[in-house]
Each structure stands twice: as C-alpha cells, then as structure tokens.
C-alpha cells in the first residue's frame, strides 16, 4: 500500500522518529550498519526513521516498512541539509517518503527559493517535504512555501536564536501557536525520554531523537564526563 500524505501524518502523530546517522571516519559509518540501527529502532517502537545520504536511504528503505525521512548533508556550514533541488530529487529517488531540506530563509546554493524547491519536489516526485527551521519566521515562510512538515531542527544553529542546552521548547510552542496548520515536529538536542514527553505535551506532532539513541560515541562520552570527580 502506498504511503499517502494523510497516512504518513497519521502514522507519525504523537510518535517517535529515530534519526540514524553516523559521520565520516566513525566506526559505524556503513550503510548496512545504519540499516541495522534503523531496523532496531523500529523494533523498539519508532514510527519512522530519519536517514542521511543516498546509500543509507536505499539500505534503510530495504530494511524497514515505516516512513523514511531522507536528507543529504553536503558540507557542514550554512545551507547544507539537502541544499539544492538536485540533492532533494536524488533523496526522493533513493526512496525517501519525506525529503528533509534546509527550511531557513537563507540563500540556497542553486539560487532557487525554498518555494521553488518545494514546488519542484512535489511536481517531480511523490515525496513530501519537511522544512528544517531555525526560527518562527523560517517556519512561517516554509509553511507559505508549501512544506508538508515543519521541524525545529535548526534552532540554535542560525543567528536568529541562541543554542539551548536541551530542546528549544519555546520555539516549538511559538510555531504551534502561530497556527501554521502544518504538523510541527520537534527535533534537536532531545536527549532524554522526559524531554521527548515534554515536546509532545507542548504540542509537537512527533519527536525526532538521534544522538541519544543511535550515536554510541556521544552517549559513552556523557557517562565518562559524568563520572569525572
């Protein structure tokens, strides 16, 4: 059965999305490994997975039956999360049900506006679009541009908001209170079950957790740091 927009929205409502990503040079930087991590997360109850890179998206699509949110990080500064339409098209072709893109108001490398990018994705693929935002103004602009989902992903990573220690629940609430009429997904620095629960209580449609579940190097460092007395 094809996953329609409404089915995906319903599948994510009040649920956990697990982000499975490893970075170049890390021991787990392997597409088969990421597929196994994603499958393990689904077995634990994840309603969807968020995956970076074409090879990983393809491997994860073959390993799980839940919605896959795909992205392509190109670089590590500025607009680098699925920064152009060509990146987005490749992510959709790899099998992503939802393409996550930089949803800020910053200039995009290919010169297209966010609205033009989203329109082309909708016209040329069956994928939905998640706009990773850094501020309320980003969210309002992304909603107007035609995004299917809004995320707090880039809160604290642009100049518009300070980087909070935990999730930016203030931004989450303001996005929801703005009545954008689009599902708002909480993402970014959600490190504990209680923080995920707080995000749902604040009105998030769904919650993305990555590092705290799928990045052993960072999780181990938290324990090591806490034990230093």
What spans do the regions from the language model cover?
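Glycine-rich phosphate-binding active-site loops on the catalytic face of alpha/beta enzymes
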Residues: 21-23, 43, 94-108, 149-162, ...
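N-terminal amphipathic alpha-helix/helix-capping segment at the start of soluble metabolic enzymes
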Residues: 1-28
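Active-site-adjacent beta->alpha loops and helix N-cap segments on the catalytic face
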Residues: 2-3, 28-31, 49-69, 78-86, ...
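Structural motif
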Residues: 44, 63, 94, 124, ...
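Conserved, mostly hydrophobic/aromatic
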Residues: 41, 60, 91, 142, ...
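Catalytic domains of carbohydrate-active enzymes, especially glycoside hydrolases
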Residues: 37-50, 93-95
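Short beta-strand/loop segments at the ligand-binding rim of alpha/beta enzyme cores
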Residues: 13-18, 63-77, 117-134, 177-187
């Amino acid at each position: 059965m094809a996953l329609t927009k409404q089915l995906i929205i319903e599948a994510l409502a009040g649920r956990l999305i697990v982000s499975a990503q490893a970075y170049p040079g890390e021991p787990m930087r392997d597409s088969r490994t990421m597929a196994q991590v994603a499958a393990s997360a689904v077995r634990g109850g994840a309603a969807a997975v968020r995956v970076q890179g074409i090879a990983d998206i393809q491997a994860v699509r073959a390993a799980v039956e839940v919605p896959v949110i795909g992205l392509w990080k190109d670089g590590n500064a500025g607009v680098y999360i699925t920064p152009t339409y060509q990146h987005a098209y490749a992510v959709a072709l790899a099998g992503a049900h939802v393409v996550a893109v930089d949803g800020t108001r910053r200039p995009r490398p290919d010169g297209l506006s966010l609205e033009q990018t989203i329109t082309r994705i909708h016209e040329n693929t069956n994928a939905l679009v998640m706009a990773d935002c850094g501020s309320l103004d980003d969210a309002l602009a992304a909603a107007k541009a035609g995004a299917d989902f809004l995320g707090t992903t880039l809160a604290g990573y642009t100049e518009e908001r300070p980087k909070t220690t935990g999730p930016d629940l203030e931004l989450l609430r303001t996005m929801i209170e703005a009545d954008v009429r689009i599902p708002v997904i909480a993402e970014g620095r959600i490190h504990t079950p209680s923080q995920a629960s707080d995000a749902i209580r604040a009105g998030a449609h769904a919650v993305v957790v990555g590092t705290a579940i799928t990045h052993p190097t960072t999780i181990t460092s938290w324990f090591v740091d806490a034990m230093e007395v």
